[in-house]
Amino acid sequence: MSTLPPSKMNFSNMNQSIASEGCIITNASISNSIVGVRTTIESGASLNGVICMGADYYETEEQKKLNEEKRLPNLGIGKGAIIKGAIIDKNACIGEGCRIGIDNMSREDGNYGHYHIVNGIIVIPKNTVLYPGTVI
C-alpha cells in the first residue's frame, strides 16, 4: 500500500463532494460527486452527480507527450468536459470538451461500445478512451 499526498485543488469549487488522496484538480466545478484516488481534472471541467473511480497510476510527461502526438486524451477528465449523473471507472481518459449525460434524457439500458447504460445511469468502463468532443 502506497501513501499518496493530499489532493491538490487549484482555483476549484467543490460542493457536497469528496476527493480521495492524490487528486489534481484545476479550475473545475464539482458538486454532489465522489472523486477517486489519483484523478486528474483539468481546467473548466464540471462534474455533477458523478462517481469517478480514479486511476491506478499517474501519467509521466513522456506519456502525455506521446498522447499529444497521437491525439489521445490524457488520463482523467479533460479541459471543459461536462459530466452529469455518470459512473466513470478507473483509468478512463475523458477528452477535452466531452459532454456526458447533460441532456437529462431517458436512456435505454445496454452496451453501447465505449459506454454502458445500467438502470438509466451512464457507465464508462475501465480503461476507456473518449476522444475530445464526444457526446453521450
Regions found by a protein language model. Name each.
Residues 1-136:
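Left-handed beta-helix
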